[in-house]
């Protein structure tokens, strides 16, 4: 039944109940019932979620009000399936070992530290099929990401050009599960996903990331093209395409998809260990396709309530 039909039905019920005598008190009560009806209606283009559920996903992700939360009881050995978590632990352990790590004049990590981190190969960074040669911190987005998240989360501090652990950082090294929870919350809620790219929109993909998690929870166990999720996201939030312009033979929708896939999968969920991807075809021949599905960590770490 359409929302307008429901409103008409409620109105008729009130008229019948009060024999046509509608007081301000009754009108206020009726208005509240109408708003509740609107906010709890199912939206077909948003996988049947209601406006109320979408609002909670957008503004209260991972809280008790959201339909998506993190599993606080995740075992340490399961948490350690996350590549970014392992890189973060290694980073914090190096700082702990050095006690006070002296940075370069530009406040970057020393080259030997960057090489030590990158040599662990927790995360593969490449441009298409070409490996990136890492010399400095600026050559590795994943290392920069771990450093930024660690600072935002209060795990490290810098004083007089020297980097050291906080008491919080030292404590979290003993609990990979708690570290993963804090890292994930900071990545989704405080770190700006646009930090490492030049896309025009600053909020696309991150604002609404909770909805992507719902989509993956529903469809992710079976491999699908990455564009499937971008298009599903666009169906629920069509206005986001307005933030992109046509150019280089791309429509605004195509430009959005490229931004969404890069931020959500390539520099987010893949590195967190929540999804895995597979490529087929050839880019130069125009036959390239990328496929994605969720990992066991995704299902062990995320909880979906009333979805």
Tell me what each language-model feature is.
Residues 117-118, 122-140, 232-259:
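Short helix-coil junctions and helix-kink-helix linkers
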Residues 137-152, 159, 252-272:
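Short amphipathic alpha-helical interaction segments
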Residues 2-140:
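Short, amphipathic alpha-helical interface elements at domain boundaries
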Residues 223-246, 276-277, 281-282, 286:
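Extended intrinsically disordered, low-complexity coil regions enriched in Ser, Thr, Gly, Ala
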Residues 144-146, 157-196, 276-307:
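Accessory beta->alpha helical hairpin/"wing" motif in late/C-terminal subdomains of nucleic-acid enzymes
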Residues 76-83, 131-142, 161, 200, ...:
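Conserved aromatic-histidine-acidic binding/catalytic patches
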Residues 56-98, 176-232:
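Leucine-rich, amphipathic alpha-helical/linker segments
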Residues 39, 100-119, 123-126, 130, ...:
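Charged, alpha-helix-forming regions
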